[in-house]
């Protein structure tokens, strides 16, 4: 599978299903994974806690990939995430992300997020723990 399909399909499985599947996350991301998002840095275990927190705070997450581009081991993504929170409110976040993939695993991400619509309290969903 090429890298951009790896990201697209992996993200659908991680985010667009209701279950928190830590085993799948561990197959997709390297244990050395580092994510820089909105001025914060998450290491692998922080990232797992982040994904678990998202599942606990939300009813559903849908990702609309506007652009996915690949150059070597790098996948650039411009996407919009629509989130239904547990209180039934909707949040939309625009995300620009650069993923680095080696040996079938994501090992690095540099990401910027911007709240498009929704409660300002949800503007940190990209890094919430």
Regions found by a protein language model. Name each.
Residues 22-27, 36-37, 63-64, 109-110:
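Short, hydrophobic secondary-structure boundary micro-motifs
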Residues 1-31:
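Short acidic-aromatic low-complexity motifs
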Residues 19, 41, 86-89:
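Alpha-helix boundary/capping and short turn/kink residues
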Residues 12, 49-129:
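A beta-strand edge to alpha-helix "cap/lid" segment located at domain peripheries
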Residues 31-43, 54:
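A short gly/proline-enriched turn/hairpin at secondary-structure junctions
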Residues 23-29, 40-41, 71-75, 129:
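Short amphipathic alpha-helical segments, especially helix-boundary/capping motifs
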Residues 5-9, 45-48, 52:
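Generic alpha-helical structural signal
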Residues 17, 39-46, 60:
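Generic, well-ordered alpha-helical segments
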